[in-house]
Amino acid sequence: MNAAMSTPDGFIKEVWNKIPAAVKSAFFGAIVIGLLTHIYEFTNKLYNYDELMNTPNGYGTGAESGRWFLKILGDIFGAQFGNYSLPFVSGMISVLLLAISAGLIADMFQMQSKLFAVALGGFFISFPAVTSTFLFMYTAPFYCVAVLFSVLAAWLMIRFPNKILLNIFSVVLIACSLGIYQAYFSNTA
């Protein structure tokens, strides 16, 4: 047994050292730039027509709008934690999910430059569509799960092209992403 892998701390260090520097840069760049860009939305309650109708016990339209997996996720999270609109909590979860997505994209494109990786993470998380998503903060974490699923599906297909089971899992991830919010299919393509 590897001495570094014998403790949880050693395992974390081993995994951390295997992550390319550009991927880490994209991840942390997305977090920092995401917080700088969206902190006003996270620290203030900005209501809109949809949120007034769906708070405190909703997550948006479900299967009737083709968002069958949003209904499943919303029901699961609603049963466990309740459906609340907490901008800071929802925003931090969303930024984390989008930062992971930015890191996966940096890995897919095999980026070497830390500066370009930070720029990728920054552009990815400060894109106007993300700002628009954060105006519907009560459902933003679900939509960011859809982004992560779509990017993860593409990453798995590129990283493991000859693994049939992972390719099938990628298709399932794409289907679930489409079942949350159809607009994020372009992330996979």
Model-derived features: positions:
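Short, Lys/Arg-rich, polar N-terminal cytosolic tail immediately upstream
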Residues: 1-19
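Short hydrophobic alpha-helices at membrane interfaces in multi-pass membrane enzymes
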Residues: 156-176
